Regions:
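Cleavable N-terminal signal peptides
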Residues: 11-13, 20-23
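Bacterial N-terminal signal peptides that target proteins for export
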Residues: 1-10
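Beta-strand-enriched cores of mature, soluble protein domains
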Residues: 24-159
């Protein structure tokens, strides 16, 4: 698997986690499933002696169809991921950040990590408007399909 494809796959999975939010239910935050798509727009690889780091920037779209009332159905985001691979291009893990200004003007910021299995763990770290009360919400996810050039679809579930 190419470094770009591996990096894109994990990077997308990473910040795809961004779309998973939560709703209040019985006084507690409750999460829901979400789906996202990632299309890489740029990448840069820095090679070391024992591995490489690939930085990937992508434009993502999140399906919030299961989100609480008042949240938009579709949200666009810009994601930045750093993926570490060994000398053979095998994924070791990475980190990512996604930022979004939704159609209503509300802002959300997500951070995530992922391991060599491609499973990512993400957190909504900060938000305004409808996202403000959801800061700290956690979710997990992975890719469900990917194109040869690195774009893909991922699925998220609340933790």
């Amino acid at each position: 698997m190419s470094i770009m494809k591996t990096a894109a796959k994990l990077a997308v999975a990473l910040l795809v986690a961004v779309p998973v939010n939560s709703a209040f239910a019985g006084g507690h935050l409750k999460g829901w499933e979400a789906t996202g798509s990632q299309m890489p727009v740029s990448s840069e690889t820095i090679a070391g002696k024992t591995g490489s780091i690939t930085h990937i920037k992508s434009k993502d779209m999140w399906d919030y169809s299961k989100a609480p009332e008042g949240m938009p159905r579709v949200v666009g985001a810009t994601c930045h991921n750093s993926v570490v691979t060994d000398p053979d291009g095998v994924l070791l893990g990475g980190v990512g950040v996604c930022e979004s200004v939704d159609p209503n003007g509300d802002v959300s910021l997500y951070s995530a990590t992922f391991g060599k299995d491609g499973v990512y763990n993400a957190t909504l770290t900060h938000g305004t408007g409808v996202y403000a009360d959801y800061a700290g919400i956690k979710f997990t996810g992975s890719f469900i399909g990917q194109l040869p050039e690195g774009g893909g679809i991922y699925h998220l579930t609340p933790k």
